[in-house]
Amino acid sequence: MARVKRGIMVRKRHKKLLEQAKGYRGARSRHYKVAHEAVMHALADAYRDRRRRKRDFRRLWIMRINAAARLHGTTYSRLINSLKQANIEIDRKMLADLAVRDPQAFARIVEQAQAAVTA
């Protein structure tokens, strides 16, 4: 069997990883061994936080809806229940956006939902 020299491939792989570590402080951007560890941790954190971001935004929307709902004399859970009973299909993202940007429209939605429950 012929001898395989891997110098070119190793250099290419190291260069690619050091490119990913660009902007890191100190040895993390210059030394392969340290940079490799930093990049692996960064990729793991990014993967985890892409999933966490979805949860965080949902929590934020719920907090905003709850705060706006309490201004209209109801709570988040009662509002969501009345929206479902009134067959008003609006997601939490849109509801939170209305609560922040257009309080009058949010108030009308709350009134419609409460009217459907009492009727």
Swiss-Prot record:
HAMAP family named in the record: Ribosomal_bL20 (MF_00382)
Keyword annotations from UniProtKB, A to Z: Ribonucleoprotein, Ribosomal protein, RNA-binding, rRNA-binding
Organism ancestry: Bacteria, Bacillati, Chloroflexota, Chloroflexia, Chloroflexales
Annotated GO CC locations: ribonucleoprotein complex; ribosome
Family according to the record: Belongs to the bacterial ribosomal protein bL20 family.
InterPro entries: Ribosomal_bL20, RIBOSOMAL_L20_CS, Ribosomal_protein_bL20_C
Keyword RNA-binding attributed: yes
Keyword Membrane recorded: no
GO MF annotations, alphabetized: rRNA binding; structural constituent of ribosome
CDD domains noted in UniProt: Ribosomal_L20 (cd07026)
Pfam families named among the record's database cross-references: Ribosomal_L20
Protein's job: Binds directly to 23S ribosomal RNA and is necessary for the in vitro assembly process of the 50S ribosomal subunit. It is not involved in the protein synthesizing functions of that subunit.
Protein name stated in the entry: Large ribosomal subunit protein bL20
GO biological process, one term: ribosomal large subunit assembly
Alphabetized PROSITE patterns for the sequence: RIBOSOMAL_L20 (PS00937)
